[in-house]
Amino acid sequence: MASSEVARHLLFQSHMATKTTCMSSQGSDDEQRKRENIRSLTMSDHVGFESLPDQLVNRSIQQGFCFNILCVGETGIGKSTLIDTLFNTNFEDYESSHFCPNVKLKAQTYELQESNVQLKLTIVNTVGFGDQINKEESYQPIVDYIDAQFEAYLQEELKIKRSLFTYHDSRIHVCLYFISPTGHSLKTLDLLTMKNLDSKVNIIPVIAKADTVSKTELQKFKIKLMSELVSNGVQIYQFPTDDDTIAKVNAAMNGQLPFAVVGSMDEVKVGNKMVKARQYPWGVVQVENENHCDFVKLREVLICTNMEDLREQTHTRHYELYRRCKLEEMGFTDVGPENKPVSLQETYEAKRHEFHGERQRKEEEMKQMFVQRVKEKEAILKEAERELQAKFEHLKRLHQEERMKLEEKRKLLEEEIIAFSKKKATSEIFHSQSFLATGSNLRKQPQLLIFMEKYFQVQGQYVSQSE
């Protein structure tokens, strides 16, 4: 198929739903045109706007397309192999460890070209999914990643100077959910994860490594899986049936869900030709043989038939739901309390008035809180001041008492010094009188005189030491 024909085919699919809806409601449209005073006219000659589809095709081919796939499944279940087989390309994805402490999402973008149609393909792999002992929150990193891509697109959309034409749209268009071929039922982790993802992304469940289960068990397993999904309220992607050209095929494919797939890039010789297959001792499982697996059906509905619908559903359903919830959280609404239309300016003014009132209320609360805290601080400071004053008075009283004690001791010491001085003077007078009285006798007795002089010298030294 030529590139222009591929683009026309994609655009034709994207617009057929609108066309069919318009044809089915033609009567109501006529009444609406009458109410709006719109007239239908027939032109007398060729004008040229019939080339609008061709213009759209040419511009789309020039711009290129993007498609983002999220692969969710346990490590080693065959996610990378299936993607390689789907796009007939070796994306060189490295093997992941089974010992990751947390679930991480790894995104890789590739540029592919078929004829002259360019496709920017992003593959997001869930590294470490299902490898933890506690798997209760394993789905949360996936939900956060999808919401982050929606938020990035919303922020770009809300910019004053936005450039959506050159913006790399990283929103997830489809989630291929890989189910282990146990043959029994869905794991609790699978149900919990798909339940939290069904409102955010288009989910297509696939049974991985379907060649490990017999055909009879596989058919029973499919019925069991769909029954569990329905009973638990999990909404998986349904291929659209409103386009007459593909309605029959998509209706049949909806009855084949979940697809049982086998992936392989190895080629095995079967008969006179080489085919992609998996070689076993008991035989060969051909990837593109519909009697062996549903790989061809998956590739047909995912890439050839419904790729544009997946892109459109992502934008019109899942992104719009996220956008609406975000704007409602911000206070924006389409109708007022009386169910009257509300313009963006009115909503802005209402929110501005609300924020102004909230700001004034917060300022008043902060002022009151500040005054209260100042009063509390002043009370604490006054109490501390009283305690310091009491301590000061106590220390002052102790100082005065100590000073009075020292003063009394000083007076007693002075009295003792005066008394000692009097005793010393009396002793000196006594010694002088004794010396004069015995002076004449000492002259007569030289030895006695020498003894008396030594005696008085010793007594004088003793008195000096006492002073």
UniProtKB/Swiss-Prot annotation:
One of its GO terms (molecular function) is GTP binding. GO terms for cellular component: cytoplasm; cytoskeleton; motile cilium. GO terms for biological process: cell division. Its main location: cytoplasm. GTP binds at residues 73-80, 128, 209-217, 263, 278. Residues 73-80 are annotated as: G1 motif. The keyword GTP-binding applies. CDD domains: CDC_Septin. Keywords: Cell cycle, Cell division, Cell projection, Cilium, Cytoplasm, Cytoskeleton, Flagellum, GTP-binding, Nucleotide-binding. Disulfide bonds: none annotated. Residues 63-329 form the Septin-type G domain. The keyword Hydrolase does not apply. InterPro entries: G_SEPTIN_dom, P-loop_NTPase, Septin. Proteolytically cleaved in vitro in a calmodulin-dependent manner. It holds the Pfam family Septin. Residues 208-211 are annotated as: G4 motif. It is found in: Cytoplasm; Cytoplasm, Cytoskeleton; Cell projection, Cilium, Flagellum. Residues 125-128 are annotated as: G3 motif. It comes from the Eukaryota. PROSITE patterns: G_SEPTIN. Belongs to the TRAFAC class TrmE-Era-EngA-EngB-Septin-like GTPase superfamily. Septin GTPase family. Filament-forming cytoskeletal GTPase. May play a role in cytokinesis (Potential). Septins polymerize into heterooligomeric protein complexes that form filaments, and can associate with cellular membranes, actin filaments and microtubules. GTPase activity is required for filament formation. Interacts with ADGB. This is Septin-10. It comes from Pongo abelii (Sumatran orangutan).
